[in-house]
Structures are given as structure tokens and as C-alpha cells.
Amino acid sequence: MSNWKELFDTEGIVEESVKEQIEEPAKYYVFLLNDDYTPMDFVVDVLCNFFNKSEEQATDIMLTIHYKGKALCGTYTAEIAETKVEQVVQYAFENQHPLKCVMTKA
């Protein structure tokens, strides 16, 4: 009977196969870009509501955007980054602001 067990004991093989197939998903950075028209308080609102930043964190990021032209809002998987970009762009459009949000591969 030990031959039977040896023939069908694939536990170690399956574990190795699964470990080889699982890899970390690619990460993407999401940035907000500066413009001359979007109010600073709107940018803070976006950072608090879409990126779960505190008021203080959002203000710091907003000032970085204002003075450096862009700032990192977060790092996400591709699907989440795409969703955040779409949500921010749509929200800005609905509120008649030209705020731009982009994603780049990390």
C-alpha cells in the first residue's frame, strides 16, 4: 500500500506549483496635477474623500501639488488606481474644475 500513497501523494508538487504561480500584482502611483483654476479647498476635499487622507495630510499634499506641480496620493493595484483616477476626474468635471489625476506604473 505504500506504493499507492507514493504514486498519488502530490501535496508537495502542488504547493511548489502554486507558489511559483502566485506573484505580487503590479503597483501604480496615483498623482494629482496642479492647475491655475481648481481651488485649494476642492483639492483637499478630493484627497480626504477619495484617498482617505486626514485634513492635515490632505493640506500637506495640496501644498506639494501647488508648489511642485504634482504630488503622490497613493500606491494601488492597477484596478484600484484606475478607479480612483476615474472617480476624481468625474468628480472634478461635475464640479466644473479642471483638476487632473493620473496614474503611472510604480
Swiss-Prot record:
It comes from the Bacteria. Disulfide bonds: none annotated. One of its GO terms (biological process) is protein catabolic process. NCBIfam families: PRK00033.1-5. Involved in the modulation of the specificity of the ClpAP-mediated ATP-dependent protein degradation. Belongs to the ClpS family. Binds to the N-terminal domain of the chaperone ClpA. This is ATP-dependent Clp protease adapter protein ClpS. It comes from Colwellia psychrerythraea (strain 34H / ATCC BAA-681) (Vibrio psychroerythus). The gene is clpS.
